[in-house]
């Protein structure tokens, strides 16, 4: 190993002081902050909020201090359809309802994984992976589908937000504390030679305690409820004693098995045209596993555009924190100019960023529009976020096409937009990725 010599460091001082530009940038950044000092005017000019395809201007939702973006994005795609179909002024489905059942199911999932890995050393990478975060707020499209199909949905008015759903830190802290304690008891019980029946009985005791904890922090979810509304024509409608699953079937009415997840992960370990799943990723035990098909970016974008041309918004996952201005709602590769200001060049490509842990899926949102040029190619994309209406343009964001290429990783589209060859590849036995693969990272946030 080579240490840093005094002579080398003195040379760096001299080189810095010889460049007047660095001094000017130093003054700007130390007074105004890094990104504000190097933000480009051009990125704002190029990325206005006018789109040739624009599906909705509905009010945005707000996940607040929680990691429920994947739920919000899915429920937002449903509510746009519901607002249109039933002629409503506005409407929101309960994210807290889905959140409750996800926490309940994830707790069971974790305990089952602990039982399945009881023969491994406590220091094994998989056991450590489980214990590092027994459960969290994040998730994947297939996981939210499992929740909707098992538990349905309810209007937000029926099961509103709580302090714990809007700010989940305390809820997660003590739920994970409880789950780690349960994990130790189960591993010790198995090590003592207890049979499967005894282990499952103990797990069920834990789940009663967990259910009680969730009900007391989030509120007991309804098994049936009454629902009434007036449409835009002032017609009154009501439902009495409807269940969450019946509400989903009647008011959402989508066959979720008709949708597939498409990823763009251009790394050597994930050839295009193949299906993939992620080990130990899920929430509902017994539900279909998370599955993706990996396709080139041009095809990936073709599918998203085709679905929006058909009038349907697109759930998608990206690395939203990369080169973005949250307040203005601009996601663009040229939003900050590190090259002209600081002589820093970003040369790492999308595959390199994935391989070297510089980028991963961090946030799910909804594509609700796109601006196409004369040849039908995308220029910029309209995004419905779930960070409230105080950021972006009343909560909507815009992404340049170059940003989409570099930092978008997943979309959910209808099966009938895939070719027969693509559908066959999706339905083939998937390659199993490691639990810590970046294509599973949206569920670890």
UniProtKB/Swiss-Prot annotation:
Its EC number is 3.4.22.40. GO terms for biological process: homocysteine catabolic process; proteolysis; response to toxic substance. CDD domains: Peptidase_C1B. It catalyses: Inactivates bleomycin B2 (a cytotoxic glycometallopeptide) by hydrolysis of a carboxyamide bond of beta-aminoalanine, but also shows general aminopeptidase activity. The specificity varies somewhat with source, but amino acid arylamides of Met, Leu and Ala are preferred. Gene3D superfamilies: Cysteine proteinases. Keywords: Aminopeptidase, Hydrolase, Protease, Thiol protease. The active site is at 69, 363, 385. It comes from the Bacteria. One of its GO terms (molecular function) is cysteine-type aminopeptidase activity. Pfam families: Peptidase_C1_2. InterPro entries: Papain-like_cys_pep_sf (IPR038765), Pept_cys_AS (IPR000169), Pept_his_AS (IPR025660), Peptidase_C1B (IPR004134). One of its GO terms (cellular component) is cytoplasm. Homohexamer. Belongs to the peptidase C1 family. This is Aminopeptidase C.
């Amino acid at each position: 190993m080579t240490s840093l010599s005094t002579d080398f460091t003195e040379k760096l001082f001299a080189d810095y002081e010889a460049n007047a530009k660095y001094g000017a940038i130093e003054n700007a950044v130390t007074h105004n902050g890094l990104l504000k000092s190097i933000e480009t005017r051009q990125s704002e000019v190029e990325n206005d909020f006018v789109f040739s395809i624009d599906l909705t201007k509905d009010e945005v939702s707000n996940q607040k201090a929680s990691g429920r973006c994947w739920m919000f994005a899915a429920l937002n795609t449903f509510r746009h359809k519901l607002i249109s179909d039933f002629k409503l002024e506005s409407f929101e489905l309960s994210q807290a309802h889905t959140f409750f059942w996800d926490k309940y199911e994830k707790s069971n999932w974790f305990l089952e994984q602990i039982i399945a890995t009881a023969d491994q050393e406590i220091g094994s990478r998989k056991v450590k992976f489980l214990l590092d975060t027994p459960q969290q707020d994040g998730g994947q499209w297939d996981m939210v589908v499992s929740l909707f199909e098992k538990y349905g949905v309810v209007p937000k008015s029926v099961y509103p937000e709580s302090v714990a759903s809007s700010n989940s830190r305390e809820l997660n802290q003590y739920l994970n504390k409880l789950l780690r304690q349960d994990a130790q008891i189960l591993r010790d019980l198995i090590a003592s030679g207890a049979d499967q029946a005894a282990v499952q009985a103990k797990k069920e005791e834990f789940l009663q305690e967990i259910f009680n904890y969730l009900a007391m922090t989030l509120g007991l979810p309804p098994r049936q409820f009454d629902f009434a509304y007036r449409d835009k024509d002032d017609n009154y409608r009501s439902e009495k004693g409807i269940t969450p699953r019946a509400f989903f079937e009647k008011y959402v009415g989508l066959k979720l098995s008709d949708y597939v997840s498409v990823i763009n992960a251009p790394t050597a370990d994930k050839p295009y045209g193949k299906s993939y799943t992620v080990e130990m990723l899920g929430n509902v035990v017994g539900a279909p596993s998370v599955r993706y098909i990996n396709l080139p970016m041009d095809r990936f974008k073709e599918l998203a555009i085709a679905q929006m041309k058909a009038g349907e918004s697109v759930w998608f996952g990206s690395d939203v924190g990369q080169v973005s201005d949250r307040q203005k709602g601009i996601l663009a590769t040229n939003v900050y100019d590190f090259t002209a200001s600081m002589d820093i060049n970003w040369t790492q490509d999308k595959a390199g960023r994935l391989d070297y842990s510089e980028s991963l899926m961090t946030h799910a949102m909804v594509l609700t529009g796109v601006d196409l040029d004369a040849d039908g190619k995308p220029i910029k994309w309209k995004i419905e976020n779930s960070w409230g209406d105080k950021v972006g343009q009343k909560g909507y964001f815009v992404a340049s096409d170059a940003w989409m290429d570099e930092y978008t990783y997943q979309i959910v589209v209808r099966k009938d937009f895939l070719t027969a060859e693509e559908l066959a590849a999706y339905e083939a036995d998937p390659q199993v990725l490691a639990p810590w693969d970046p294509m599973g990272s949206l569920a670890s946030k």
